[in-house]
């Protein structure tokens, strides 16, 4: 029986693909070597210890239907579209070795007539007239008996959108968490205009087989039928949840301020695990009572636009004469925390 396993996803859903990856990693025998090939439609993928409000333009992502996905490995934030090819190599210890998987990807690129080299801990770069340019970034995860290396290759990604979603709004955010390092990148189509996702997957697969001296049939993973993976439904539910993607952010503070015709408002939030642990409101409004009441209501509230809006609008029952001010406040807060 082969010790290799090759899986190819036909889904572009980042939560589905990351849930598949997690399930395979947890249940694979320690003697198995796995290659998983996949890609995501418009998604910002953040590292396990990152703060999405710090890393991403969450408001623009929501407007453009770009998903947020938190992965289980460390590292920085990346934007995925269908111009990216994603790969995951898994193996049990002591055989797990990220230099092996890196060399497999380099061999695959070489077979496609792309001369690339490893740079730093995580990147693959190519030489261009403008200097070295990154075409691949990676992240890693290890447990006591196994490890994985996953990464992306930029084929024909819309690089302008990287800046759209990975440059966060200039919010007054004092946040802990790992900040992403921005690198100069290029697409492989700059070197090979006709290159496709299918060609890259085939090249990586062949390099994988060549390294281990074995071949195996590909398993196609599809959301049309629930994958036969232990605990997949629960893993997918967690991977797609707000609590995981946003709520796992490290503790941070957020300061919001705005001047309305009826007065200035300053809000101070402390947020832990996606919940407001402390809310302070300062205002020069002639009637501060609704804002003082709001501070009390927001304690323990989920740090989510719809929940904050709900708490603002709940005050209309007690302060109906200030409906105009409260609706303005509600709309502003909801926009400011997206």
UniProtKB/Swiss-Prot annotation:
ATP binds at residues 71, 76-79, 134. Its main location: cytoplasm. One of its GO terms (cellular component) is cytosol. It catalyses: L-lysyl-[lipoyl-carrier protein] + (R)-lipoate + ATP = N(6)-[(R)-lipoyl]-L-lysyl-[lipoyl-carrier protein] + AMP + diphosphate + H(+). Its EC number is 6.3.1.20. GO terms for biological process: protein modification process. Keywords: ATP-binding, Cytoplasm, Ligase, Nucleotide-binding. (R)-lipoate binds at residue 134. SUPFAM superfamilies: Class II aaRS and biotin synthetases, SufE/NifU. One of its GO terms (molecular function) is lipoate-protein ligase activity. Gene3D superfamilies: Bira Bifunctional Protein, Domain 2 (3.30.930.10), CO dehydrogenase flavoprotein, C-terminal domain (3.30.390.50). Pathway: Protein modification; protein lipoylation via exogenous pathway; protein N(6)-(lipoyl)lysine from lipoate: step 1/2; Protein modification; protein lipoylation via exogenous pathway; protein N(6)-(lipoyl)lysine from lipoate: step 2/2. Belongs to the LplA family. In the transfer reaction, the free carboxyl group of lipoic acid is attached via an amide linkage to the epsilon-amino group of a specific lysine residue of lipoyl domains of lipoate-dependent enzymes. This is Lipoate-protein ligase A.
